[in-house]
Structure formats: structure tokens, C-alpha cells
Amino acid sequence: MKKELLAPAGNMECLKAAVFNGADAVYMACKSFGARKFANNFDNNEIVEAIKFCHLYGVKAYVTMNTLIKNEEVNSFIEQAEFLYRNGVDAILIQDFGMICLLREKFPKLEIHASTQANTSSYETAKFYYDLGVKRVVFSREVSIDEIDSIDVPIEKEAFVHGALCISYSGECLMSSMLGGRSGNRGECAGCCRLPYTLLDGTTSISNEKYLLSTKELNTTKYIDRLINSSIYSLKIEGRMKSPLYVGFITKLYRRLLDEEKVDLDFETDKLKTIFNRKFTKGRLFFEDDASLMNQESPNHQGLVIGNSSIYKDKIKINLNRGRVLYQNDAIRFVNSGRGMMINFLYDKDMKLCSKADSVCYVDNKLNISSSDIVSKTQDYNLENEFKNIDSKKIEVSFSVVARIGHPLKVSISDGYNNIVEEIGCVNEAKNAPVDDQTIISKLSKLGDTPFTVSNIKIEKDENVFIQIKLLNDIRRILTEKLINMREKSNINFESCDLVFEKSESKCSSNDFITCLVYTDSQIRACLDMNVSRIYVCDKKLYDKYQNNSNIYYMLSLIHISEPTRQ
């Protein structure tokens, strides 16, 4: 089964990086309803251009609308989905299965994917979404590849193969709301899992590590053969808040692996470490154990270790490890101190300015560092330039020319899927020099800034024909413009049904219903005196004292943040 390589795009630059580096499909979000609210995302004008751009290059365009939807947002949600559908979106990713049901009823032919937050982790959940009319499910990142293969439901399977992991189950994080005041289920993740914590046994700290909830980055490049032979159809890269360099590099790497090119994986992984890594894990997808999922030392970009530093007069001396190179305009980080800098000036072993070093070198001590350290490279200037200058993707087209004296010039263009035929002007008998095949080929091949490149030109013509050069130029322009327009609108197939919302009687009680969370005996008594409807107790001993009261419930504490002050 041919796999789909699905890449992220937080903005137009990232989208182009994905398309030009081999993505089969791209996923992105509008300004509303996406689970990455703090990515740049696309306004309605931009999303239309993004969809057209993807379709022009034969790439599918998916849009995420995967937040949980409030009642007052339902109409806006449906309007946004309709706007996307009318403009040719290939699929919409949704978490809220209430919205799945509404869109399935309103737009029967709109392709819907259940996002990873929809918790597809078993046969039952996959079958549930299949029965709702969902075309594809994105499996939870807690599910192994063997489990995915064992789920025998006629539904497309998608799984994350690279990028950041969420410590909460399938990205459904309540911690962000509770601690950061921003709901991950509403696209506003506060990144609480990347903060430092102390693990306590009573009041005693029992861990030397700070970042107890911070996961490594998923990386399955070593397991590409197993992925190719799996039942997973779409291989998904995380990263809608990452840079165009990250998106382009990761997409190109997986493209090469899927196309079974010969890849020096160690060499490419070193590049990847420079671009972004929190250390790597094969994830639950490939049976990673708990400890190996986590990087509890640091939540940030680690870079690639390239050598060691020491202080020499007013400079920092760097002894580069074998095979490591440092360039002017690279960025480095001193691992133990956690401080970093750009290299504006690089000096060789003789203290002369240079642009590249591969053994001993010196940099200015801009940070006033006073001790030796391990050095990692966190930004590679040459690698960034390499991806900035990447050629745009070209689509192969063929032309067919028929030139008969006394008839219009007839030319067709084909991209292998679409065929357009145009006639223009009139072919005359040559009075002097007849047009030759090479002239026709030369004029039709001048595709300039179009996304096309010529693979073949077939010519049928009478002897001694004359064709105006202007006719060849005009018909080439007309054909390419029509083909661009046809490709851009390749998935516009809108169909809708009326959607009726039946009003139901309010289920809200006229009586106030008050719920309280308490920690102490005095708080419980105060709540009972005030006739609080429901009381949650965190302390098990305290709950045992009042367990016969039907209004009092014991609440398990998943994460112990701090001991509250007793009153």
C-alpha cells in the first residue's frame, strides 16, 4: 500500500516547504477552531490560496477544526466548515463528535477525519467513527503499531511518526487549564508539561530531575520499513508551530526514506539534531518504555554536541570533535551553563578570522563565561541557506501540436490527469522559410515562472507551414493558465443538505447547584451548613469520615502540586 506523507503548515512559508520537499498532503488551520491557536495559521483569504497552492502541485489540503465546540459556536463552526468545503478542502479534522454528526448530516460528501484528540485507540472507537461516516482516524499516540495493525475496520489509518509528544492522553490536557488558565482542548496549550516540577514524598524531594513531565521528540526514521509494511496509510509529522526549515527538512527526509532512497541516517540525524530536538524516542508506537520517553533534564532544543570549550584570554576556545564543523553565523549553546550565542566572528587556531573551522577555533566571549563547558550547535547557517535556496517543485506536462494549412493551430496540454485542447488563428503556407519542429518546441518550452516543465512535445504538421510566433506564445499562455486553474479547483464538489436544529426544553433546574472542592474538616462543615449540593474531598481519611453522606465524593488527585495551607 502506497503511503501518504502528511506534513504540517503553520503559515504559507511552511506550507511551501512541505509541498516542495515531497509531502503528499498538508494539514493546517484557520484562525478559529484549530488546536494550535498560537501558530500563525491562515485567515480565510490565505486558506483559499493555500488550498489552491496544494492542489496546483497535486498535494491534498486538510484543515484542522479540532477544538471542542461550545454551543454558541456551533453556527460559526458550520459556516467555517462550509466555507472550506466550497473552496475545495480535501478533508476536515475534528475532535468533537457532535460536530462530526452535524457536518455528516449537513455535508454528506465532505471528507471528515477524526483527530488524535478523538481518542481512537481500539477496535471499538475505530468502528464508532466508521459508523458515523468518518473516512479516517488519527490514532492516539499511546497506541502501538501492532495494536493499530490488529484493528480490522474498513477505515483509513493515520499515525504520528515524528515530532513533539503530549504527556496527557491523546492530547486531551486538563492540566493546561488548571495550572495555566488556557485549555489545550480549545487550542491554547500553555505547555505546562515543559515546566519544572518537584517530586515529593510527603515533604521530601525524591528526584534530582526538574522536568518530570517533559517528553522527548518522536522519531521513527529507523523503523521506516515496519511503517511501510503496516496498515497505517498516512504518516503524520507534528509541527505546526515549527519553522519552515524544520518542516522542509523532516518532510524531505521521510520522503527519501519512503521512496527507498539510500540515506545515511546517522548523518541526517545529526542535521536534525541541529535543527530541533529534545532528544529522540521511538515512542509508544514502537514500544518505548516509560523512562526512555522522557527528557527530564531539559524541555528545550538540545542541539548537536560538537566539542568542548575552555577560556583563553578574552576568547572562548572550542576543541571540535572529529567530523564536526563550525561556521560563522552558526549558533552554539554551552550545555552546563544553559547559555547560548550567535557566532558573529570565528577565529582559526592562529587567531585569524575565518568562515569555517573543523578542529580548534575561537569565538568572542560575549557571555563572559568563566569556566569550561560542553558545546552544542543549535543553528546551522549553511543548512538554513541550503533549504532557503531549494528549487520549487515542477509538474511535468506534454504538448501535442497539429498544424494543417488552412486550419486553426490546434495544441493540447496534458499533466497526465487533465487534458486541455485549444485552437487559435490559422496555419498558412510558408512563402519563404517554413517553421521547423525546433522552433515550435522552443516556444512551447518557455514556461518561465509557471509550475510546469515540458516532458514531451508531439508535432503533426503539413510540409511548408508557416505559424506566427505570437500564436505559439499565446496558445502556450492560454493552455498553462487553464491548466493551473483546473488543477487549483480540482476538489471543488460542493453538496449540502438542510440542517434543522430542533428546540428542546431546557434541562436546567431552576434551583442553584453548587459544587465545592475542599481540603479540611472545617471546610466540609461550612459547606454542609450552606447546603452545598456536592462536595469533593481530596483527603482519603477525611472522606472516610463523611462517606455516608451522599453529597460528599472522594476525588483522586492525579498530580500533587503542593500541600495547601491548613486553616
Which residues does each predicted region cover?
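Short active-site loop/helix that positions an aromatic residue
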Residues: I100-R104
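Glycine-rich, highly charged phosphate/nucleotide-binding loops
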Residues: F42-I47
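A short acidic, helix-capping loop that chelates divalent metal ions and anchors anionic groups
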Residues: G34-K37
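Beta/alpha (TIM)-barrel catalytic core signal, keyed to glycine-rich beta->alpha loops juxtaposed to Asp/Glu
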Residues: N119
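Surface-exposed amphipathic alpha-helical tracts and adjacent flexible/coil segments at the periphery
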Residues: M1-N21, A25-S32, V48-I51, Y57-Y85, ...
